[in-house]
């Protein structure tokens, strides 16, 4: 079993910054993450998405933020275990002291007195659209769950389905490069930041964004149909 001062579940921005804070105290850390790279959803879902609300940093992409955190923790002692999940956490006693024992899906075992859970929304699973049977079969054929390269959508017609922060943020950002962005949401009300929603609606007024609410989306390989929700 591997012994560590702090075991961190999740290697996103919070998990990485925990390594920095622990390092200042001379503590070593072990990070475990289900993804194949550090950075959490910032690296997996929207590496090129601009971030404006980091204290002291007016503008930074999500991947730049992750890269800065990785650079920040270089001086400190930590181990990174990727592409595995925590399968078991149990309390054990060793030499009359209490520890946490952690076992992963790769059958690795760790013991630590401290566990920090920095897992965000948990192991990443895309939010699949309702009423579409097996949407994964369209991946790579015009359907994606994440924007990993803005240039891919340059001068393209883009349809975004969703009503939260990511949908609103990418509607605003992709409108700068896409031929036309259509935002589809199954409700009239949005769940994202008010400021971003106002930006989106301003783009609708300018004709740069086509807004369809309340709509559901159905997909086939050759066409899209957007039937309205009946009250």
List where the protein language model places each region.
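Short amphipathic alpha-helical segments
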Residues: 19-21, 43-44, 127-131, 171-173, ...
């Amino acid at each position: 079993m591997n012994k560590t001062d702090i075991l961190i579940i999740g290697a996103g921005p919070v998990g990485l910054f925990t390594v920095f804070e622990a390092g200042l105290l001379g503590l070593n850390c072990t990070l475990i993450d289900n993804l194949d790279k550090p950075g959490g959803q910032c690296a997996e879902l929207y590496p090129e998405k601009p971030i404006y609300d980091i204290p002291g940093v007016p503008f930074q992409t999500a991947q730049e933020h992750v890269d800065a955190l990785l650079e920040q923790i270089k001086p400190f002692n930590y181990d990174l275990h990727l592409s595995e999940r925590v399968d078991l956490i149990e309390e054990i006693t060793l030499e009359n002291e209490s520890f946490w024992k952690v076992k992963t899906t790769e059958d690795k075992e760790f013991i630590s007195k401290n566990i920090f859970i920095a897992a965000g929304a948990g192991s990443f699973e895309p939010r699949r659209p309702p009423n579409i049977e097996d949407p994964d079969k369209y991946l790579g054929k015009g359907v994606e769950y994440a924007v990993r390269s803005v240039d891919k959508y340059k001068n393209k017609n883009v349809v975004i389905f969703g009503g939260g922060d990511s949908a609103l943020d990418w509607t605003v950002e992709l409108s700068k490069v896409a031929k036309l962005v259509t935002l589809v949401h199954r409700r009239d009300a949005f769940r994202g930041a008010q400021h971003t929603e106002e930006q989106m609606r301003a783009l609708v007024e300018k004709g740069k964004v086509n807004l369809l609410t309340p709509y559901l989306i159905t997909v086939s390989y050759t066409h899209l149909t957007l039937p309205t929700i009946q009250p």
